[in-house]
């Protein structure tokens, strides 16, 4: 799977275009002499949480609950364009709806079924969560898996 672009209907969220190979999300501190200006709050973690949500993470995590509340309040739609096995897909999600290539999925379970077709014989979320971690508990779980 190759991520191509993460975007939002909210103009405050600048689209993120992914390049071939490894992509690293970092914050840039512009004023080096101002100790109060940090890279906190510029959207690094939010970008990862958005990708996780778009790729089927359930609402049990507090990060996803916060994100869904924001999407509902601001009427925002997130979009992720990705490629898998030579096919390009465009996923869009609001707080309660999902579209895949402009086809509406009323239920999350139907949407998850599609994601599972990408990795036949496995659960997409099970595989994805091994490599993609957005909260502290998931880091702790990774340590448990290797120890």
For the regions a protein language model found, what residue spans apply to each?
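Hydrophobic or amphipathic alpha-helical targeting/insertion segments
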Residues: 84-96
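Glycine-rich phosphate-binding loops of NTPases
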Residues: 95-147
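Extreme N-terminal "head/tail" segments of very large remodeling/mechanoenzyme assemblies
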Residues: 1-87
